Regions:
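Short, highly charged C-terminal tails/helix-capping segments
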Residues: 172-178
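Short connector loops at helix/strand junctions that flank enzyme active sites
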Residues: 21, 36-40, 47, 61-63, ...
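Unchanged
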Residues: 73-96, 100-158, 162, 167-168, ...
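Nucleotide phosphate-binding site architecture
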Residues: 5, 12, 27, 53, ...
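Conserved beta-strand and immediately adjacent loop positions that scaffold enzyme active sites
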Residues: 42, 51, 133
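Conserved Nudix-box catalytic region and its N-terminal flanking loop in Nudix hydrolases
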Residues: 46-89
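Conserved hydrophobic "DFG−1" position in protein kinase catalytic cores
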Residues: 45-46, 54, 118, 136
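Acidic, metal-coordinating catalytic segment for phosphate/diphosphate chemistry
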Residues: 1-43
């Protein structure tokens, strides 16, 4: 950031009084501009027969790989609204959003991923502009080796374990940077 979005004056990077981190501070109006983690919000859309809806990505990062419908939360929406919107945008699928199921903290890329359980309302779905294809998968059919992001893989593994136990439990994971695949964005 070079200029203040409030007044247009230059900003400088320094530690504000009574703070402990560098922040962008306007040199004229003294507004402190905080850069906080981005929220990635999505759904685990399940059809009544237990299959899960996945999207094959048409965009980078991880073009051509499979994922749950998810994306950046927008201002002015709740996390549940964001999960439903992303499912509609990426898979043209309508869902009833349920409970928050997983949270993954990824401090190395300044992101927090939130995934909700969701019920597909019908089988009228198709690829959105960010998806090459969308499909329903049983646990055994999921393309585990071509899942785009670690939070998606961990969430699906946990989801199927919980489903076998007959009860679902929220889980929270702090993910460190991957050491084996530096191109893995999460």
């Amino acid at each position: 950031m070079k200029f203040c979005p409030e007044c247009g004056a230059p900003v400088e990077l320094r530690v504000p009084q009574d703070d402990h981190r560098e922040r962008h501070i306007c040199t004229v109006c003294t507004t402190i501009h905080y850069h906080n983690p981005k929220l990635i919000v999505g759904a685990i859309p399940e059809w009544e027969d237990g299959r899960i809806l996945l999207c094959r990505r048409a965009i980078e990062p991880r073009h051509g790989l499979w994922t749950l419908p998810a994306g950046f939360m927008e201002n002015g929406e709740t996390t549940a609204e964001a999960a439903a919107r992303e499912t509609l945008e990426e898979a043209n699928a309508r869902v009833a959003i349920g409970d928050l199921y997983s949270m993954h903290n990824l401090p190395h890329i300044d992101q927090v991923h939130l995934l909700f359980r969701a019920k597909l309302l019908d089988l009228d779905f198709s690829p959105g502009v960010e998806s090459l294809e969308v499909a329903l998968f049983t646990e055994n059919e999921i393309p585990w080796d071509t899942l785009a992001f670690r939070p998606v893989k961990f969430t699906l593994q946990h989801y199927f374990e919980d489903r076998k136990k007959g009860s679902f439990h929220f889980f929270n994971v702090d993910l460190k940077p991957p050491v084996d695949k530096p191109d893995n964005h999460a």
